[in-house]
Every structure is written in C-alpha cells, then in structure tokens.
C-alpha cells in the first residue's frame, strides 16, 4: 500500500501526472493500489479532462470495493508547450506553486472526495498558467505530516520556507531541497509514512 505516481504520455505532447495515497497498508492495500494505478492510466488515456478521469476511476473502484479502502488522488495534466497545468483533486493535498523569486502559494483545491468511498461524485478541474521559472510541487501528506522527535509535523509553512530561503533553479534542485529539509527536520525519528513528491517546472524553452 502507500503512495504511488504515474507519468502518462498523452496526445499533443501533454503529460498526465497522478499522485496518490492509498488509505491502508499490507497486501490488500497493495492490491488496491495496483488496481487504482491501472484504472488511472486507462482513464487518463481516454480523456483530457482530469476531473472526468477521476470520476470514471471512482465509479469503478466503488463498484468493487469490498475492503472499504480509498485512495486520495491529485491528477494533473501539463502542457509543456503552453505552460498550462489542469488538475482535479480527490481528497488530496493542494499543489504548491513556487515563483522564481522563492515566493510560494497553495493552488486552490477543486473539491471532490477520496476515490472509492461513494458513487456519483463530481470532480471539477482547475487550470493555472505557469510562467517561465514557475515550479509546481505535487506531493503526498508524508511530507506535511513528517514528524520529528518532539512530535511536531513538518507542515505546509516549512514547505514555504524551503523555497523562500533558496528559490529552485531547476526541478532536481527543488526536489532535493524539499527532501533534504524533511530529512533534517525529522532527524533520527523513524519514518511512519511514504514520502512522495513530483515537480513540474516551466523553463524558458517550455519544458
């Protein structure tokens, strides 16, 4: 069980980027994760609307969900040519937009509950225009809920601080800065949850 992500090649050079977190651990959760991942890939290929894809996957998971598990998903579609990022949220953490000067903000959530819980749920989509140098962090709650020896969580505010102190110059640097910050905060405390983070960045040549 735990986190997963998929990189899906779509038409017109677009990329589908689902980031997800399954509710449980163990063998049943691992099977549920595999099923969720397969269904997401199939739904993504059939539509360019991330909300429609989540709605389709939710219905399929709910029909067969005898274990009463669920999966939170943030599904984004990025167009490198235009810099447009369209996303839909199923009970997941809000993506973080980081500007070239290091300022950052959480992008608005779109509503929509975790997948597999209930049928007939609508998943609205939202589009943001990335400018050159903009970076978007797609992550799971393993980052925000990472805990140190005093029982404090890393939290969203520390995510903002990571980039305020050192604006990312590329995707690799953004990812390393985030993981280093979490690692330094946690110290020797055992990791209790999966930690997953994807980076979408638009640079001067549209990638």
Sequence positions of predicted segments:
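Conserved subregion of the PPM/PP2C metallophosphatase catalytic domain
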Residues: 1-23, 27-33, 37-207
